[in-house]
């Protein structure tokens, strides 16, 4: 059950990040070990209640044997940003560790839950490795239809 929830959260995060090239590296994203070459989303933009395919391509400079992610998101409602819960996760619960250095690809298809609110979102994803070093840090802002 926890793994299913974690996968849904990671996939939702990827939907938000890739929608309309609205992601950027965080300010101060110093010496990231993962460089994103391409993020794609079909259809773009994603639609609530429909299936979406998310694909990621990049390059990892060092092997990852373990690590963590911190994902925070805010939703714009009633004229202001409302912070949603922050999620702390183990990278190896989503990916098979160790993750080897070199080219990296990830692709998945999911149905965007019908209960997902339409609207404007913003947030940040920070990934760290087994030594608590920066893997990458991304910010995003998007609209989910």
Curated annotation (Swiss-Prot):
Residues carrying covalently attached carbohydrate according to the record: 134
Domain of life: Eukaryota
One Gene Ontology term from the biological process aspect of the record: sterol transport
Pfam families tied to this protein: E1_DerP2_DerF2 (PF02221)
Keyword line: Glycoprotein, Lipid transport, Signal, Transport
Signal peptide stretch: 1-20
GO function terms (MF aspect): sterol binding
SMART domains according to UniProt: ML
Record PANTHER family: NIEMANN PICK TYPE C2 PROTEIN NPC2-RELATED, PHOSPHATIDYLGLYCEROL_PHOSPHATIDYLINOSITOL TRANSFER PROTEIN
Role played: Catalyzes the intermembrane transfer of phosphatidylglycerol and phosphatidylinositol.
Record-stated family: Belongs to the NPC2 family.
Subunit-level organization: Monomer.
Protein name per the record: Putative phosphatidylglycerol/phosphatidylinositol transfer protein DDB_G0282179
